Amino acid sequence: MLRSDAVTKGIQRSPNRAMLRAVGFGDADFGKPILGIANGYSTITPCNIGLDVLAKRAEEAARLAGGMPQMFGTITVSDGISMGTEGMKYSLVSREVIADAIETACNGQSMDGVLAVGGCDKNMPGAMLAMARMNIPSVFVYGGTIKPGKLGGCDLTVVSAFEAVGQITSGKIDEEQLTAVEKNACPGAGSCGGMFTANTMSAAIETMGLSLPYSSTMAAEDQEKADSAARSAEVLVDAVKANIRPLDLLTTEAFENAISVIMAVGGSTNAVLHLLAIARTAGVDLSIDDFERIRQRVPVICDLKPSGRFVTVDLHNAGGIPQVMKLLLDAGLLHGDCQTVEGKSLNELLADVPSEPPADQEVIRPLTNPMYSKGHLAILKGNLAIEGSVAKISGVKTPVLTGPARVFESEEDCLASILEKKINAGDVVVIRYEGPVGGPGMREMLAPTSAIVGQGLGDKVALITDGRFSGGTYGLVVGHVAPEAAVGGTIGLVQEGDSITVDANQLLLQLNVDETELAKRRAAWSKPKPRYTTGILGKYARLVSTSSKGAVTDQPD
């Protein structure tokens, strides 16, 4: 029995069938599974501009495999384009909108399964949230990574352009060089090319078995990506027949596998937020502390941007995520019995993958010679982050810094100060009221961090925030500070010049002010008026949970 029988079977459903006949159904089609094709195609961003080709290939393949595909659209927000603007407040919000849209279309039409096609950062977790909520057979198709831009023999990504802004203000480059970077950073379709958020989340989804092997590192414009989309549709039809559902795959062990792979590839801090949200939706007991536990045992073995040398297409050519998983599996760092949407275990899928990466590449290192001996996403706690915070410490030359607080109430104020060269070596920059509630929307701080790096202060300044960081960020940065300032977190009590310690070795984020003084400040603090009271941002601020629990909107703290 199919779920779609509710709209296709029986005399009472004659009007329903009449509507379906108008969109291409014939007599023989009413017993076939109805499959949603959630198409994130958009000309807003290079991340999504190629998705229509993939969605149409999947649609065709689903029909040939015996399904009845029904295409519908989902939205996207371009993080790269909205970065540093008020529009960035809508980025994390779009994750919830995408999840709500897919859930609404699929459940509203009694669909039997869904294939979601996404590209930009929030497309992946948005689709996964919907899949976990609905628990109908599901497959995710990633739009693919952009190929690197080229300039002077060097690979460029969009982060190169952000860093160039800092370089021009510090006199390291001129406007002509800035324009050259701008014109060459993004050469075509695909998501941002380093191990930034989109590629991190696609790798996590592949690891958890809801997308096909090798698909998360394919280039958007290559033929194999379109072929993989078609194969994904065939797998979805089989999954409907076999009744393979997302919650069969999204187990505690699957999330641990995803975290292990994210550590191994040097992935984005945003993965912490998104995996916590997906796990909470799936009913899996995952906490922020699990990331620290796994970090302690899994090294970083991939030399990938933003802190490394290579981009995601290089990882693909070196063996992709299956090669990384094979190394972890052989070392006992992966649960090989986890199942995938193809009906096979990871042990089975990885059986023919070599136990060693190719000798003619430098992207994937053996575990005996890692980039870093432990994972790069550290969970820091202390009186500034009682619930926790997330620090990305790969490539950090100064993992411990105690310095004076430079306090800013918004990203814009901070960026202006950086570009005016008012931030000095040894400072601890604090950007607050940028959390899920306070922003609202938890903006990414790529513009300030890139400007700091561009001015040569990346190893000399710490930056902490209750907002987020782009997957392209590196340096001594600590985000997701919880509780956030807007709900009374200690970060809201910091004053200009206070001493703050950021210690990645001791996992400490501490405001060096005695408790008596903090109690006085807390008594004097009052909750600020919300920046938005209506529209989607006002609604989001009223509903959203703390970042330490994934910043979801459908489950109160």
Swiss-Prot record:
It comes from the Bacteria. Keywords: 2Fe-2S, Amino-acid biosynthesis, Branched-chain amino acid biosynthesis, Iron, Iron-sulfur, Lyase, Magnesium, Metal-binding. InterPro entries: DHAD_IlvD/Edd, Dihydro-acid_dehy_C, DihydroxyA_deHydtase, DiOHA_6PGluconate_deHydtase_CS, ILV_EDD_C, ILV_EDD_N, IlvD/EDD_N. It catalyses: (2R)-2,3-dihydroxy-3-methylbutanoate = 3-methyl-2-oxobutanoate + H2O; (2R,3R)-2,3-dihydroxy-3-methylpentanoate = (S)-3-methyl-2-oxopentanoate + H2O. Pathway: Amino-acid biosynthesis; L-isoleucine biosynthesis; L-isoleucine from 2-oxobutanoate: step 3/4; Amino-acid biosynthesis; L-valine biosynthesis; L-valine from pyruvate: step 3/4. The keyword Amino-acid biosynthesis applies. GO terms for molecular function: 2 iron, 2 sulfur cluster binding; dihydroxy-acid dehydratase activity; magnesium ion binding. Its EC number is 4.2.1.9. Its cofactor is [2Fe-2S] cluster; Mg(2+). Mg(2+) binds at residues 79, 121-122, 444. SUPFAM superfamilies: IlvD/EDD N-terminal domain-like, LeuD/IlvD-like. [2Fe-2S] cluster binds at residues 47, 120, 192. GO terms for biological process: isoleucine biosynthetic process; L-valine biosynthetic process. The active site is at residue 470. Belongs to the IlvD/Edd family. Homodimer. Functions in the biosynthesis of branched-chain amino acids. Catalyzes the dehydration of (2R,3R)-2,3-dihydroxy-3-methylpentanoate (2,3-dihydroxy-3-methylvalerate) into 2-oxo-3-methylpentanoate (2-oxo-3-methylvalerate) and of (2R)-2,3-dihydroxy-3-methylbutanoate (2,3-dihydroxyisovalerate) into 2-oxo-3-methylbutanoate (2-oxoisovalerate), the penultimate precursor to L-isoleucine and L-valine, respectively. This is Dihydroxy-acid dehydratase.
